[in-house]
């Protein structure tokens, strides 16, 4: 009855949105001469329907640059199609997802398809993700599940979640075995197209959670299998990686709050190894937070869909202690400091033995006025890396210092400015230091009466090599995040216009160009660009009805 009434109300009061995007480059990569099968234009179309915050539905279609449209392996038009339906809070049914969806339970040691933006940002917004079923409305072609998932309230304190997924994956099959899984979603060349949808993966599992007053407990389990054995080459640092054709992970998550203390964690096991992450947060006084995080990911623990806090990109082969503190002891000032001590019990990429490292960060933010703010951030990181020289291959420490100053200023609602200065210093034992500099200026203007908004940004960068590279975040299109990196010497400029004709029509266009002053070629291989300039334009149209 609830679902029928919800659909009737949705048909009458629901909101529709159509969003399309085009990216057009003004340069030609080498791959378009003989290798890539389609045009260099990127295009996506997204239709979404929403009723309040309780019903979502949508379709996504996407073609990456270089992929054919309506031809060859994409004879049905786009390279990627996605459908999703999410129903929330319908009586005892707390969530029901059909089509493409995402999952996150506990601290992510068993399963999490959330987007994480780095260790420091993750720690500062570290929350338990127990019982979250979400729609997959992005054009990400790998990090999702396809099937059905649901959460039901068994009682006031107990929730039960279950899910099933069946989907095709890209990869390489050799002699009847899967030797690699291809995660980029790119099918531009015949070689890439031959990897498309070669094998299937089925996954099923569930979560039981209990929450009463200050206590929260949960158990999450998943079982997944491929239709062919997964047998990648296991040598060196990858010796303990995933292999076989059926796998499982089981985890227990827990949380408890007492006065100013908050404790959360999860412990999980797999076919081999185990992992545990525990976090204690304490607020001694108002406007002060102290956080302690301990993680232990054994070298032979493997969870294909895990994503959690750490220095590395996987919840494997890492252990460490993290402490962070944020405080505002007096008016206008905010301070953040953190220190992470970590180690890797087994080999890693470019490190042929167990290694260790440290990561420290200090940031001071000063906001004397609502229209004026600034911060100074310093980060120090020490890790180890293999270096090959006259004495053979040695594992030596490397040191990375990063310094950033940013000033934000606004002149009413019409004009705002952001100035950023970056400095990088990278060196290793017995080797000369490499340095990187960057100056970035952004000016944003708003004309509300004309419904026109404009951003102009320019950067000058000068780095010695890749290790001393710099980053610059830019305003972009809706639902996108763009932070390119630069190495060498040159400048980058971008201009973005956003025009709202009315509450139904929105148009955004962005032009960007990067010019290198120290080279006549950009990139390598099929991505090689002849010349020192790289320019493109992006356009996006949104229609609400």
Residue ranges: model-predicted function:
Residues 7-34, 49-59, 215-217, 535:
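Transmembrane beta-strand segments of Gram-negative outer membrane beta-barrel proteins
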Residues 142-188, 197-209:
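Aromatic- and glycine-enriched pocket-lining scaffold segments that form the walls
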Residues 62-80, 134-141, 194-197, 424-432:
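Outer-membrane beta-barrel proteins
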Residues 27-45, 49-57, 61-67, 73-81, ...:
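Outer-membrane beta-barrel translocator/receptor signature
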Residues 117-128, 174-190, 475-480:
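Surface-exposed loop/turn segments flanking beta-strands in extracellular/periplasmic regions
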Residues 75-131, 137-170, 287-304, 450-466:
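Outer membrane beta-barrel
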Residues 1-3:
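Short, small-residue-biased leader/transition segments that mark boundaries at the very start
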Residues 36-40, 201-232, 239-545:
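Exposed, low-structure sequence patches enriched in small/polar residues
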């Amino acid at each position: 009855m609830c679902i029928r009434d919800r659909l009737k109300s949705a048909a009458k009061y629901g909101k529709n949105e159509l969003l399309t995007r085009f990216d057009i480059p003004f340069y030609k990569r080498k791959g378009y001469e003989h290798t890539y099968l389609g045009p260099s234009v990127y295009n996506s179309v997204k239709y979404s329907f929403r009723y309040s915050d309780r019903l979502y539905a949508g379709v996504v279609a996407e073609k990456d640059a270089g992929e054919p449209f309506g031809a060859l392996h994409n004879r049905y038009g786009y390279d990627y199609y996605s459908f999703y339906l999410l129903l929330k809070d319908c009586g005892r049914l707390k969530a029901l997802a059909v089509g493409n969806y995402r999952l996150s339970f506990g601290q992510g040691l068993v399963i999490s398809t959330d987007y994480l933006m780095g260790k420091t940002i993750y720690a500062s917004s570290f929350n338990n993700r127990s019982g979250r079923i979400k729609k997959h409305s992005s054009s990400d072609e790998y990090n999702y599940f396809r099937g059905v998932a649901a959460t039901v309230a068994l009682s006031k304190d107990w929730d039960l979640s279950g899910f099933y997924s069946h989907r095709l994956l890209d990869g390489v099959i050799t002699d009847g075995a899967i030797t690699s899984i291809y995660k980029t979603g790119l099918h531009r060349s015949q070689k890439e197209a031959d990897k498309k949808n070669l094998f299937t993966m089925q996954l099923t599992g569930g979560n039981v959670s209990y929450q009463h007053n200050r206590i929260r407990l949960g158990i999450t389990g998943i079982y997944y299998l491929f239709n062919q054995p997964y047998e990648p080459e296991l040598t060196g640092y990858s010796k303990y990686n995933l292999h076989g054709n059926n796998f499982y992970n089981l985890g227990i998550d827990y949380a408890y709050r007492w006065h100013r203390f908050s404790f959360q964690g999860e412990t999980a096991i797999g076919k081999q190894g185990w992992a545990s992450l525990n976090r204690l947060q304490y607020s001694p006084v108002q406007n002060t937070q102290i956080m302690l995080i301990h993680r232990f990911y054994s070298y032979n623990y493997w969870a294909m869909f895990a994503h959690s806090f750490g220095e590395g990109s996987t919840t494997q082969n890492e252990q460490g202690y993290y402490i962070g503190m944020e405080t505002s002891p007096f008016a206008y000032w905010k301070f953040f400091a953190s220190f992470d001590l970590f180690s890797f019990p087994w080999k890693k990429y470019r490190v042929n033995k167990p290694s260790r490292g440290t990561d420290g960060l200090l940031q001071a933010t000063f906001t004397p006025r609502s229209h004026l703010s600034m911060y100074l951030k310093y980060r120090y990181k020490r890790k180890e890396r293999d270096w090959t020289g006259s004495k053979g291959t040695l594992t030596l420490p490397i040191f990375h210092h990063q310094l950033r100053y940013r000033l934000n200023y606004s002149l009413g609602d019409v004009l705002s400015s952001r100035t950023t200065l970056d400095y990088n210093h990278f060196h290793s034992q017995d080797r000369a230091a490499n340095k990187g500099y960057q100056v970035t200026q952004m000016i944003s203007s708003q004309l509300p009466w004309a419904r026109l908004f404009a951003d102009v940004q320019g950067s000058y960068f000068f780095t010695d090599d890749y290790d001393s590279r710099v980053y610059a975040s830019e305003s972009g299109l809706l639902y996108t995040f763009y932070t390119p990196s630069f190495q060498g010497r040159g400048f980058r400029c971008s201009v973005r216009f956003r025009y709202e004709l009315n509450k139904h029509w929105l148009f955004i266009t962005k032009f960007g160009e990067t010019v290198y002053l120290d080279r006549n070629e950009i990139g390598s291989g099929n991505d090689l660009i002849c010349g020192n300039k790289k320019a493109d334009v992006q356009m996006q149209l949104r229609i609400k009805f």
